[in-house]
């Protein structure tokens, strides 16, 4: 097993161990396809895509595991809970943006999420995408018979 784990780039001072998982090309390909690392996306589209995923998968736990799961309004209360959590997450993104970027750092490349303007676009895309996908999940769960909640 010691032959598989070695220092990253044969430099023991980096502080990262290269394992077969962390240094494989498959892992790199999967990580490069995530919207946070994909090349050529604007901050708005990054936030939109990340928000779409989060809004959609946050709906299920609130509907199936929420305190009103056995009532007639389980779906609607799960939707409202999801929107509430999305608001809290967006507030957290806002606080991080104010703390990290403060006032007016401007650079020529606005696609790197390291400026206030780019972070605000990311945050807006996240909010719109998450609320939209939570609404889409609500429509799917309420109208498609295969997805009905019992």
From Swiss-Prot:
Pfam families: PsaL (PF02605). It is found in: Plastid, Chloroplast thylakoid membrane. Residues 1-72, 145-150 are stromal. The keyword Transport does not apply. Residues 94-123 are lumenal. Disulfide bonds: none annotated. Keywords: Chloroplast, Membrane, Photosynthesis, Photosystem I, Plastid, Thylakoid, Transmembrane, Transmembrane helix. One of its GO terms (cellular component) is chloroplast thylakoid membrane. One of its GO terms (biological process) is photosynthesis. Signal peptide: none annotated. The chain crosses the membrane at residues 73-93, 124-144. Gene3D superfamilies: Photosystem I PsaL, reaction centre subunit XI (1.20.1240.10). It is a multi-pass membrane protein. Belongs to the PsaL family. This is Photosystem I reaction center subunit XI. It comes from Trieres chinensis (Marine centric diatom). The gene is psaL.
